[in-house]
Amino acid sequence: LDAVYSSPLKRAWATAEAINRFAGLPITPERGLMEIDGGAFEGVPFAELPARYPEENARWDNTPWLFKAPGGESMRHVFERMQMTVDAIVRANPGRVIAAASHGCAIRNYLCYALGWPLERIADVCWCDNTAVSLIEFDDGFRPHPVYLNDASHLPEHASTFATQSWWRQGAEHAAPAVK
């Protein structure tokens, strides 16, 4: 490991510290790795979103590439921000092994790009478990080539955030219930 970057937000930073435990490298804070700014969605329980923000919640569920919470960041912006951020990190560290700690939606946006897909295919990209590892190699032209995605084999089953949740699975039977 040659370099560690992290979103300055607490959970990603704690992950970066765990990654860096034995390397002892400086962790470089990178605001471009931050999670989507959820605007009015921030702090609202998922179960309340359909009732409070029906149109925006429907976009999140059905056409996530068009999503933008009131006062928040658009999915398109996150997609472009993550591309620019990771590209800058890779170009600043040619030939080096880099760890970058980020957040679910931001990671999902970057993986969509790294897979060579347009943002409109983001719903086809898996949600990654907390602390899951995705390995992406970059060629001499700094183009990403995913090797593997969402490897959480280091986690015992009880520590997996997704083992006990179903909201991330596709299909109406797994959707969060609307609050009446």
Feature-to-residue mapping (PLM):
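Phosphate-coordination/substrate-recognition cap region in phosphate-metabolizing enzymes
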Residues: 1-57
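Short beta-strand scaffold positions
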Residues: 6-7, 80, 101-102
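Amphipathic, non-transmembrane alpha-helical scaffold segments
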Residues: 9, 50, 75, 79-83, ...
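Alpha-helix capping/helix-boundary segments
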Residues: 11, 106-107
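Active-site signature of alpha/beta-hydrolase-fold catalytic machinery across serine-
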Residues: 18, 109-113
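Acidic, low-complexity terminal tails and accessory targeting/binding regions
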Residues: 36-48, 91, 96, 112-180
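Short glycine/proline- and acidic residue-enriched helix-loop micro-motifs
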Residues: 56-77, 170-176
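Generic beta-sheet signal
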Residues: 89, 96-104
